[in-house]
Amino acid sequence: MNLKPQTLMVAIQCVAARTRELDAQLQNDDPQNAAELEQLLVGYDLAADDLKNAYEQALGQYSGLPPYDRLIEEPAS
């Protein structure tokens, strides 16, 4: 499956943002939910790995794309 670079960029940013939210929730939430949150984080981490691999391929095919690390940075408040 080939995705457009813009689609990959949006997906990477969304997964990174959700991962940050889940991490924060895991730190601040009721320990009873910890197992569920950790399971969700594993799924998001696997998705992030797949998206990173696809984006690295796109970097080789398209010019002008930002580095992956810039896409996953937490936005300044």
From Swiss-Prot:
Annotated organism of origin: Pseudomonas aeruginosa (strain ATCC 15692 / DSM 22644 / CIP 104116 / JCM 14847 / LMG 12228 / 1C / PRS 101 / PAO1)
Assembly and oligomerization: Forms a heterotetramer with Tse2 consisting of two Tse2 dimers and two Tsi2 dimers. Formation of the complex inactivates Tse2 enzymatic activity.
Pfam families: T6SS_Tsi2-like
Task of the protein: Immunity protein that plays a role in preventing early activation of toxin Tse2. Binds to a large surface of Tse2 and thereby occludes the active site to specifically inhibits Tse2.
Biological classification of the source: Bacteria, Pseudomonadati, Pseudomonadota, Gammaproteobacteria, Pseudomonadales
Disruption phenotype: Deletion of Tsi2 is lethal in the presence of Tse2.
Statement: the UniProt record of this protein carries the keyword Disulfide bond: yes
Key words of the record: Disulfide bond
Protein name: Immune protein Tsi2
